[in-house]
Amino acid sequence: LRSRNDPGRRTLLKGFAGLGVMLASGYGVRERVLLPELLSDYRTATGERRQLTLAQGVDLTLDTHTALDTRTTAAGTELFLSLGRVLVSAGDIRLSTANGQVLPAPRSRLVISHNLPWQAGTQVQVLSGSASIKLARGDSFSLDAGQQVTFDSQTDSTPRPVTVGADAWVNGLLIAERMPLGQVIAQLNLYRRGVVRCDPQVAALRVSGSFSIDRPDASLDLLTRVLPIRVQRVFGYWANVVAA
């Protein structure tokens, strides 16, 4: 029998402790999105995208890990996005988040996202048409086609051009144009059954290209062929992206 001070035993225990930290951390990631997913009127699971047509003539595409509710107010029907990302082809509808309200013009197409791992606050991207935005604090402004803005309940950013491939996720793609690797990994992580971690040492590497979100592990392998990185996989569930 080995003694309690045996180096091999200590190494094994450290390994289990490290795995425990990873499991706890991973649980925290899923816990953050679990409650709104379970309680919302419309929700999507890991890797799922869902298309909806509402009675108001509104077509919606919900991205993975999205939670959306329908509310009836004195002003009419309102959608409330508590988590995730949605493509809106607008009829007569209003969409709100905790940070404000978005009112698309008729026949407009918008991507609206809220509380994403790589994005603080709410982001509105107008692909066509226009939209009016009213912040929770009361300020209002408008966006035209080709503009996007990110805001929280108190502040808003200056409108800038819509990101390349803003709606590519609808077709199962992530389009990156000099995107930080950390953000690419964060996006792929949402579509993968498991957890992907990106080492801060390589998180700032810039990535350009087209990647499948329906096959996130294949996309991780593709990244190793174009960047000086490697992927460490643990039990097929955990993946760590580190320097090669």
Located regions from the model:
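Extreme N-terminal targeting/processing segments
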Residues: 1-35, 212, 218-244
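Short N-terminal micro-motifs specific to bacterial/archaeal maturation
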Residues: 3-4, 137, 175, 210
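Short alpha-helical basic/polar micro-motif
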Residues: 10, 60, 186
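Short charge-dense sequence patches
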Residues: 11-14, 33, 81, 132-144, ...
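Short low-complexity stretches enriched in small and charged residues
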Residues: 12-21, 82-86, 153-154, 161-166, ...
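Short secondary-structure junction motifs
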Residues: 37-39, 193
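Short, small/hydrophobic-biased targeting/export segments
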Residues: 40, 46-153
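N-terminal export/assembly leaders
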Residues: 155-244
